[in-house]
Design a protein with these regions (language model features):
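Internal catalytic-core helix/loop-beta-alpha segment
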Residues: 109-113, 117
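Conserved beta-strand segments that form the floor/walls of ligand-binding pockets within enzyme
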Residues: 4, 113, 134-137, 172, ...
């Protein structure tokens, strides 16, 4: 199983994002861009204009995680900006197939994210069409939260739901990922890991990305 580490810049210094991204790019698979609108979650990160600048200047592919209302509008826009992957929240959407179709039409991967309280079975009709499932292991909205170990069973259920996974759907976890939690998430079946605080609070962020990959691969 291929392991992917995607540092979240939610925990980086927004005043020098280019530098912060450069610190981890060579060791990372993607950069995780959290987009919050202060509506779906009680926090705000970047407007569309700033997000487009970040995506355009990023030296490695961008994984855009949309914690916003009306993902029917936002998801295709972020694909158009050049995101390699666009993930929207199941709880915010009503027209799932429209989102999936439009994001794919713009050449991006599409993922569905689930809050901790949302069961895996709500996306059973879409697993054959999406490219990633994101299991939130914290409540979305803020970085630096503690890993919710009770979500490991949900990761196992998601891995089981993917079956033989001939389409290569990624199973991502986001929230509280660190050297002390990534092994259990990997054992449960996750293959793609978002890490924010653990990476950007480390003395050497790139070395931390490498360490996380090593632990998850063991």
């Amino acid at each position: 199983m291929t392991i992917r580490i995607t540092p979240s810049i939610l925990n980086a210094d927004f005043a020098k994002l280019d530098e912060e991204i450069s610190r981890v790019a060579s060791a990372s698979d993607l950069i995780h861009l959290d987009i919050m609108d202060n509506k779906f979650v009680p926090n705000f990160t970047f407007d569309f204009e700033r997000a487009a600048e970040i995506i355009k200047s990023c030296p490695i592919p961008v994984d855009s995680h949309l914690m916003v209302v009306e993902p029917e509008k936002a998801a295709p826009a972020f694909a158009e900006m050049g995101s390699a992957s666009v993930t929207y929240h199941f709880e915010a959407a009503t027209e799932h197939r429209k989102i999936i179709r439009e994001v794919h039409s713009k050449g991006a991967r599409v993922g569905i994210a689930l809050k901790p309280g949302t069961p895996i079975d709500v996306i059973s009709d879409y697993i054959g069409e999406i490219d990633m499932i994101l299991v939130m292991t914290v409540e979305p909205g803020f970085g630096g939260q503690s890993f919710m170990s009770e979500m490991l069973e949900k990761v196992r259920v998601a891995r089981s739901a993917l079956g033989k996974n001939e389409r290569g759907v990624w199973l991502q976890v986001d929230g509280g990922i660190s050297p002390s939690t990534i092994a259990s998430a990997a054992e449960a079946g996750a293959d793609t890991f978002v890490a924010g605080s653990a990476v950007y609070k480390a003395e050497d962020p790139a070395a931390m990305v490498t360490l996380l990959r090593q632990i998850a691969t063991q």
